[in-house]
């Protein structure tokens, strides 16, 4: 005699998923479907964007280091003149610092060219002016460090992110920006390890030195510096080819390609609108403890589904 309990299967699994999604919502977690909870439970790799996820995304200028005989206030004034056109939190920090110092600027530059995930390029008094990442200023634009100032450049503080300002092909200033790590960042990394995630990766547009310092501080397994938006998505594709399940956590426009490429993309609620739209799961901005809750809820869901399956099928074996 064979008894058909397929109706029990058809009922128990959707109910378990809906119950898990409802439980997640009580912790301010928005999940767009049960398969994303399954992906979180099965994931063996978590990829974090640094700015806005592991940090508070409230950067402030810590110091301005002039090069090539430039004056500190003048290079900050010039940087703010360009950065006010750039929709990025670090750019806003530069503009805010110039305003705090009373450095009001006139629009002396020509048309501004905004290069996504790189920086800003324009022309002032017939000279090309660029500001942005190390890769953009030195590799893409070919700027050089002034002679005899290499040692000064090498001594840049590692604990800060850096914006590089080049004028006429020569480095004119480095703006050091502090964006403090979330207090719970190290605890979250440790907690995810204990919950069975073997590989935690950080990606950032910051320099190698800054990325290394952050990774060592919070105990991240792998880190990649000076990455572009396409680099994050390409990394996830390579992990998929290696048979790994990948979760991506990000909050910015630049994270959107990687969020859509991951098995489940997680966005911060107060991040960029496009990141929230692309992401499969949204967490609150107050802290990262929701990640540990999400992992526990996902694991509990999969245990419940497997337990129900065994019990229902077991009736047919009796």
Pin down the residues of each PLM region:
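Conserved phosphate-coupling serine/threonine residues in phosphotransfer and NTP-handling enzymes
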Residues: 6, 13, 203-206, 270
């Amino acid at each position: 005699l064979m008894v058909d309990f397929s109706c029990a299967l058809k009922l128990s699994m959707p109910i378990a998923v809906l119950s898990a999604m409802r439980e997640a919502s009580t912790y301010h977690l928005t999940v767009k479907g049960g398969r994303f909870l399954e992906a979180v439970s099965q994931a063996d790799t978590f990829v974090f964007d640094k700015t806005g996820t592991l940090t508070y995304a409230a950067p402030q200028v810590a110091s301005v280091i002039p090069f090539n005989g430039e004056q500190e206030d003048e290079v900050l004034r010039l940087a703010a003149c360009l950065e006010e056109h750039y929709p990025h939190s670090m750019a806003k920090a530069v503009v805010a610092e110039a305003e705090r110092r009373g450095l009001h600027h006139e629009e002396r530059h020509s048309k501004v060219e905004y290069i996504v995930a790189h920086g800003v390029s324009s022309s002032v008094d017939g000279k090309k002016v660029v500001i942005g990442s190390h890769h953009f200023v030195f590799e893409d634009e070919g700027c050089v460090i002034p002679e005899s100032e290499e040692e000064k450049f090498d001594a840049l503080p590692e604990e800060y992110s850096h914006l590089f300002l080049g004028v006429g092909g020569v480095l004119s200033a480095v703006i050091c920006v502090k964006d403090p790590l979330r207090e719970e960042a190290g605890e979250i990394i440790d907690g995810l390890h204990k919950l069975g995630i073997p590989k935690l990766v950080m990606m950032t547009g910051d320099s190698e030195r800054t990325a290394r310092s952050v990774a060592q501080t919070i105990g991240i397994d792998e880190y990649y510096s000076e990455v572009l938006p396409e680099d994050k998505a390409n990394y996830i594709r390579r992990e998929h080819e290696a048979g790994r399940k990948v979760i991506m956590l990000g909050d910015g426009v630049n994270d959107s390609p990687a969020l859509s490429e991951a098995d489940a993309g997680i966005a911060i609620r107060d991040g960029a609108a496009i990141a929230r739209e692309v992401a499969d799961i949204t967490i609150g901005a107050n802290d990262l403890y929701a990640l540990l809750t999400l992992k526990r809820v996902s694991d509990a869901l999969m245990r419940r589904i497997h337990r129900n399956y065994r019990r229902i099928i077991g009736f047919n074996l009796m």
